């Protein structure tokens, strides 16, 4: 009888783009620098095999990382595998591929000695360049065979008769997780087991993934190797290759050569599109929706912080925090960009002005083409041009100012209600306005509604950053060191007083430190945290390049955050605000500042000594 060697059809893989997207997410968010192998799953669609393919594809997609997402059936078989993701391209290149294949093959072989249905699996080595969105990978399906063993075809291939074919289909439908069964001499199909009488075995029934009429799948070698160990006396047997595709199921009569079961040899690396034994590379930057690429890429540097430098950093609390920026000028623009860099996704900007010709060179969210546009709206549009998926809104709004009497109550009441709604719907408020009286009402509302308030103010060569607002905090607000109530400081200003006259770098310093203080505060709500300290105030001086960390307590007679003011606002709402705007003496009387001034004056008349702390100087504890 003429014998010919058995040739097999290699396994092919198909890796969907969603697989790499999920891999990049897991690498960034969970695995970090870990190179431990992770378990993944694939499925083989035995029925729908492309006509141009030599075998059904080992399909990998996003669901491969969660076994529960892959449903198995008689025609859709689930397969377990391993993924080894390298930390650098150099590590990927230098990895001993043959040793890795042998190690994975040995593990599968060991499992198969206990259960022949575990004789097949797969492994992937990869490197994900998350900056360029290029993925390098190589798939292997470890195949093993004893070095001196040969498998010869004695007869066939020939078609399986219809009655046995139907019986085999029913058996695999009822045992869809099995790959192999034993066919007895009487034609019965039994689940594979060891210890049967060799003379009672006619052959093996194997689920076949090949799409070639006269050639079985490469997995056959693994099954035959295990069978030859379990039944060493069986030298000839029939192999029934069951197929679910349009290709007919076939039968082969094979012979196993006389050999000692010595060392195993391993193969199984997949060839690339040029039929070379080489890894593949796929550049997804041009294939995936650019918005999806941007969504993952904008947080890349932040997530890399968690790998080694700050593993406990909470990025979600920053991402989900809704930030309201009052003032869309120089401070507002730099603050918004810094918030974006920290991953903040919800930013609302408020202003009542329009972009002037002097703005674009100092305020980075504006260009020459924006001149004349509403500042807040133009700034929000600029943020969306930088990152289209950010939830940025611009609101044109006049904030009612203490010391400026109400002229159009309906209009000012409408702006007041809008401001209250904005503050209530956000978590944090940045006060970046250009006058003290404009900051008074937002400071009051921030304290009343228990919001985080980040305050920043500029001088010519100095700046102040402070956090306040939360009811639980006993720190002073922007007005707690004032002994006078804010009044109209805008009327009668000269040009140099109407414009922000400050050294250009001061705004960048103030905005960046305000955002850093905000982020540190979110990590611990006031205590030392993974990012370091979280001071109450920061005062910077560019003339001598020094910075002071300061702390001052809340003032019982503060014109903005004292209980007298908050209680009255709680009772009267807009009527209270209207009276405060119209009557310069009302807040001074209500807060108790008038009484304190009178007591001071009386002490001076009586010859006593008292030192009045100026609101612009000391009164702080240096920490």
UniProtKB/Swiss-Prot annotation:
Keywords for this protein: Autophagy, Cytoplasm, Protein transport, Transport, Ubl conjugation pathway
Keyword set includes Transport: yes
Gene3D superfamilies tied to this protein: NAD(P)-binding Rossmann-like Domain, Ubiquitin-like modifier-activating enzyme ATG7 C-terminal domain, Ubiquitin-like modifier-activating enzyme ATG7 N-terminal domain
A Pfam family that the UniProt record links to this protein: ThiF
Catalytic residues of the enzyme: 499
Motif window: GXGXXG motif: 327-332
Principal subcellular localization: cytoplasm
Subunit structure: Homodimer.
Annotated protein name in UniProt: Ubiquitin-like modifier-activating enzyme ATG7
Gene name tied to this protein: ATG7
């Amino acid at each position: 009888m003429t014998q010919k060697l058995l040739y097999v059809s290699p396994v092919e893989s198909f890796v969907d783009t969603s697989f790499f997207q999920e891999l990049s997410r897991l690498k960034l968010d969970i695995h970090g620098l870990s190179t431990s192998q992770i378990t993944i799953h694939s499925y083989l669609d035995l029925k729908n095999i492309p006509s141009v393919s030599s075998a059904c594809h080992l399909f990998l997609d996003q669901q491969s990382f969660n076994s529960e997402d892959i449903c198995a059936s008689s025609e859709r078989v689930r397969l377990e595998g391993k993924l080894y993701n390298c930390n650098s391209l150099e590590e990927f290149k230098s990895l001993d591929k043959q040793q890795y294949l042998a190690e994975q093959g040995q593990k599968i072989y060991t499992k198969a000695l206990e259960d022949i249905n575990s004789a097949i699996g797969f492994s992937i080595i990869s490197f994900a360049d998350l900056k360029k969105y290029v993925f390098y990978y190589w798939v292997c399906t470890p195949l093993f065979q004893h070095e001196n063993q040969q498998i010869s075809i004695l007869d066939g291939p020939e078609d399986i008769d219809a009655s046995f074919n139907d019986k085999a289909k029913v058996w695999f439908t009822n045992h869809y997780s099995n790959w192999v069964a034993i066919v007895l001499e009487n034609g019965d199909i039994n689940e594979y087991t060891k210890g049967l009488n060799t003379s009672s075995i006619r052959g093996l029934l194997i689920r076949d993934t090949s799409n070639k009429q006269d050639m079985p799948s490469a997995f056959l070698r693994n099954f035959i190797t295990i069978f030859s160990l379990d039944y060493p006396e069986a030298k000839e047997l029939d192999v029934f290759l069951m197929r679910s595709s349009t290709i007919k199921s076939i039968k082969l009569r094979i012979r196993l050569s006389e050999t000692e079961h010595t060392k195993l040899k391993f193969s199984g690396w997949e060839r690339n599109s040029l039929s070379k034994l080489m890894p593949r590379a796929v550049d997804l930057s041009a294939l995936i929706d650019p918005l999806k690429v941007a969504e993952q890429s904008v947080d890349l540097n932040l997530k890399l912080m968690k790998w080694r430098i700050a593993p406990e950093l909470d990025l979600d609390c920053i991402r989900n925090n809704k930030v309201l920026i009052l003032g869309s000028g120089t401070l507002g623009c730099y603050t918004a960009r810094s918030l974006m860099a920290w991953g903040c996704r919800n930013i609302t900007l408020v202003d009542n002005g329009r972009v002037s010709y002097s703005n674009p060179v100092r305020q980075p969210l504006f260009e020459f083409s924006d001149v004349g546009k509403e500042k807040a709206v133009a700034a929000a549009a600029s943020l969306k041009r930088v990152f289209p998926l950010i939830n940025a809104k611009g609101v044109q709004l006049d904030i009612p100012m203490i010391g400026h009497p109400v002229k159009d109550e309906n209009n000012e009441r409408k702006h007041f209600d809008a401001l209250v709604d904005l503050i209530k719907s956000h978590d944090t408020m940045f006060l970046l306005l250009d006058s003290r009286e404009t900051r008074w009402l937002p400071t009051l509302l921030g304290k009343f509604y228990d919001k985080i308030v980040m305050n920043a103010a500029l001088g010519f060569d100095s700046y102040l950053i402070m956090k306040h607002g939360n009811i639980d905090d006993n720190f002073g607000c922007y007005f707690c060191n004032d002994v006078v109530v804010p009044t109209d400081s805008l009327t009668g200003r000269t040009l140099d007083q109407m414009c922000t006259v400050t050294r250009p770098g001061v705004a960048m310093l103030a905005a960046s430190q305000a955002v850093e203080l905000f982020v540190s505060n979110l990590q611990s709500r006031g205590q030392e945290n993974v990012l370091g300290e979280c001071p109450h105030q920061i005062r910077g001086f560019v003339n001598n390049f020094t910075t002071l960390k300061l702390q001052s307590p809340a003032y019982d007679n503060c014109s903005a955050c004292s209980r007298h003011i908050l209680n009255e606002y709680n009772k009267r709402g807009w009527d209270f605000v209207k009276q405060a705007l119209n009557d310069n003496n009302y807040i001074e009387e209500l807060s108790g500042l008038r009484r304190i001034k009178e007591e001071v004056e009386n002490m001076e008349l009586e010859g006593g000594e008292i030192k009045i702390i100026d609101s612009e100087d000391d009164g702080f504890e240096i920490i």
